[in-house]
Amino acid sequence: MIDYSGLRTIFGEKLPESHIFFATVAAHKYVPSYAFLRRELGLSSAHTNRKVWKKFVEAYGKAIPPAPPAPPLTLSKDLTASMSVEEGAALTLSVTATGGTGPYTYAWTKDGSPIPDASGATYTKPTAAAEDAGSYKVTVTDSKQVSKDSTTCAVTVNPTVPGG
């Protein structure tokens, strides 16, 4: 009997070319030969190896339904449209990506220019200064190169009041 589940753990949803398949499964003893496939699929020796392989690929595709597609990439936690921070306080912006296919990459920008070394789900400037005011955004990209832009957040840095 063909162990389709075992084969699926090795190859996923798509089988490689037949010569790669047989070389790989030889070590796992799932399907040892074309003769074995002919018997399992009810084909005679009159069927060519190419025909046997075609029938096996069809049977493989039907044996275990494909995995459902990943939900779309979204930001379950997005940036707010605006925020204020006191000068000297920490400026922290954060998003949470869900769906898509991880891992994710993050590209933060301020006023349309990339922020060097800002590559995580959270961007923190430990001590905000007046020049940190501006429009911040992050683009999240999953491993299949699907991207999602955050809301643009207008950051205001309030000056500290002397002696206050």
UniProtKB/Swiss-Prot annotation:
It is found in: Virion. InterPro entries: DECO_N, Ig-like_dom, Ig-like_dom_sf, Ig-like_fold. Keywords: Capsid decoration protein, Capsid protein, Late protein, Virion. Residues 1-72 are annotated as: Binding to the capsid hexamer. Interacts with the major capsid protein; each hexon binds a single copy of the decoration protein. The N-terminus binds to the capsid proteins with high affinity and high cooperativity while the C-terminus displays an IG-like fold. This is Decoration protein. It comes from Escherichia phage T5.
